[in-house]
Amino acid sequence: DSIDNEPWRYAVQIDYYRRLAAGELGFQLVYEGKVEPGLFGLRLNDRPADESFTVYDHPHVRIYKKVDSLSAAEIHERLLWGASQPWYPMRNAPNKTLMLGVPASETPTSNDANWNSVAISNTPFAIVVWLLAIELLGLAVAPIAATAFRASPDRGAFSARMIGLLMVGWLVWIGASLNWWPARTLVVSIITITVAACAWGWYVLRKRSGRPIELPSVRVWLAALGIWGTGFAFFLMLRAIYPDFWQTWFGGEKPFELAYLRAIARSTEFPPYDPWYSGGIINYYYYGWHLVATVTRLTGLGVSLGFQLAVATIPALLILQIVGLTTTITSSWRQRRPRPTVIIAAVTSVVAVSIIGNLDALAQIISMRGLPRTGFDFWRSTRVIDFTINEFPYFTAIWADLHPHMIDLPVIMLVLTLVSGLVLAPPRDRQTVIVVFSLLALALGTAAVTNSWDAPLCAGTILAGGIWAGARVGGRPGITIIVGAIAAIFAAWIMFLPFFSGFYSVVGDISRTATGSPLGEFLVVWGIFFLVVLVVVIADAVILGRRRTGWRDALVAGIACLAGGTAAFAFAVVRGGTVPLSAFVALWLAAGIISAGSAGAAPLRLGRVITIVSVVAAIGIGAIASHRPAAVIALSFALVAAWYAIQTRPARALPWILVGLGCLAIAGVEFVFISDDLSGGDWQRMNTVFKFYNQAWLLLGAGSALLLAHLWSRSRTLPAGDIDHRSAANKDITLVPHPRTAMRSAVVRRSACVVGAVAIVTGLLYPTFGTTARLAQDMPSSPQFLTLDGYAWMNGGTIQNATGDTIEFDGDLKAIEWLNANARGNPVILEASIGPYRGNGSRISSATGLPTVLGWDRHQRQQRYPAGIDRRMSDVHTVYNDTSLPSKLEMLRRYDVRYVIVGDVERYWNSADNPAPYASAAGLDAFNALVGNGLTVAFESGHTRVYEVTPFARLAPAPGAVHIR
């Protein structure tokens, strides 16, 4: 049994014993004797135990009798799979093999994610079931969420659903990863009930002990349901209008996501098998799909329907989590009428983060000289900066790719909400500390294994928030909080150690960017948020900077920035270079931003150290204008945000911190990028910009919206009521403003609010015109009625290849339905590997979850070693074109293929560069020649035929051969 633990070393031996036990080598089992330890009638499988215990104490004995004599060629054919596995003659594998160690067909799977046939056949009922499942997950952990957000007026009602999903999902995953229990529907149900019992049992104990947990009111819970339910209904309606899982040019990566989601939903152990690299494990950030699969298992709605519902659920939960963040922060503001401010802040934040787009929509309308009826390019707005991706949450929602970066958006917002609550109301009792930091560890770990790009932001936020909260409390309780924050980061790694221990990252080192973003394109992406922040700063500068010292501070800071830029420009010219016009524009903009911030925040009156640091920072920012003009703007806003944050109360500092973090994120990618498989080309920083811009949109959107709401709330307050200057600290001072001063301040602030609101409303141009443009991109065969059937377009769906031949998909759809209904276990299929996007390649494995020899090679290169991918790509093409029957069958045996797909994609797909069809006519005819001699026709419909590789004959054990006691 020990050789099973080293498949890289004993692949052939393992395959031999596996075939022997299956009766495929001509030997019949005539006797099997073993003793299984037991207690109270329960048997314990001790096979994984050390051999010194099993072999020498109670060996497992098998006796085989030779019945059939196989030739050397027949034995060779049976052991082809083992002989083709990567072999390393060492005790330890030199690298992570990323392989299962057994054929994919023998991995344990379950098809219990579609147990609810009644709901699957009734879409309205299925929607209700899904909604109830999300609510159930939230209610299960309501006492835990209420403890974590005990100081927030919502008492965790806005975060409970995410917390419940994360808790249940992790418990299912960790058990399946450590082989404690399988990932199945029954286990998900038991864990959900257990979590609810523990949470509510704890609630009862706390109540009896005189320390009750204050739960959210029914009204607040229903309000949360209404918020996320409304968002869910809106985004689900978009999916019902445009349900297609694939489209020739604008289909996205849904086939990839569906394949992996199906494989995860079918896997009972983790890591799951790779559906696009048979015999391999998924070496990708699959955990977000596991969370979706958890709800799919719980509801029994199946992956196809679950995918559509999840695509609507994620942005809806993001909206709810944004409301949770704004409620947590704004409820701590000191104001006379808190409720209107909370509502305005929540609505503004939701719109700014989840609904609006960037300024490219306005640019398109201006270029069209009027409101467009047709021709609006919704895609262009996400590719503003050349060779990068500049997506934002609304595009992500209507694009409807269930990708890791999408799934992780509400997780990031949950971390920000938890940290905000930690800072504003630091926990002091031990139980609350444990709850808060346990949830932070869970959320951080989830972010790391869902979309690792988000982990640094989440970890840094937790650490900084813990230090800040600890400093506010002081003493031993403060130290406990700081230690808790550090422990949460380590706990996150330990909680997900099974994932990291088997994961191999193809992402390389941090590299320096050759060039930054053009200033104009950069401002198109971020101009809305920058303008909102700028009007807030200018309002303060106008009101507070009217003092002589305010304008003097502004002059000093602005001159420092200009001095740094001028020196850098001169140095560039001396070295023979040129200074682009954008650098001058960026320098003067930065000087203006810094001057206004200095007048409003008055950092130069906070002591000598702050003054020196501020001046040096202003000089440094100006100095980089010559070669990174975009970074200059972002860093200027970051500096101003820092000035405000260090001298205001935590509740008012948090929006500035969000803005500052967002600006640092987008400034950082102007200097460095993470090396990946795109390194060395024009697109080398594509993923870095893409991922960090996603985070920055959340931070800047929420931060700027909160600043605007706060500005509105101050329209009736004292001019200086928002800044806690050191000179007035710890003094009980009541200031009565002059009526004229108060009126002037109110006018300035309200005018600034109008400008900021107009900026945000401008962003609504994108959803107004981009939504209809996106919905118009469905396949011509897509149903003209509302449906969530993502494969309905295949019924009558066709495309043209490069030479004008028609590729039909009717037969493929029937083959998919047949395989889903009749394929048992986890058989390997063979279909054309034609790369991503255009030709609907790998459509059968995507729609069934069955492992194929090779799916989209481009995505596999992001996950595993290239040599195996190249070999498989060549082998798959060879199988479809080879006319030698023995070699054709040998290749199928080598990859343990059970079903061979021959449809129009295999028959006709080609490209302009290579007009020859993917499979030659002679190669396809050879499959027919093998029928009856290694193949059978298992299914046929239209132009699609499914061949089944004839399995090897098996000898069943002799009657009465097995003896177990």
Regions picked out by a protein language model, each given a short descriptive name:
Residues 1-107, 766-965:
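Extracytoplasmic
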Residues 426-444, 475-487, 549-564, 604-617, ...:
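Short hydrophobic alpha-helices at membrane interfaces in multi-pass membrane enzymes
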Residues 32, 39-53, 58, 71-218, ...:
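Membrane-embedded, hydrophobic transmembrane alpha-helices
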Residues 483-493, 560-562, 608-617, 711-771:
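Signature aromatic-anchored transmembrane alpha helix within multi-pass, membrane-resident enzymes
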Residues 136, 185-239, 336-350, 434, ...:
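Start-transfer (signal-anchor) and selected internal transmembrane alpha helices
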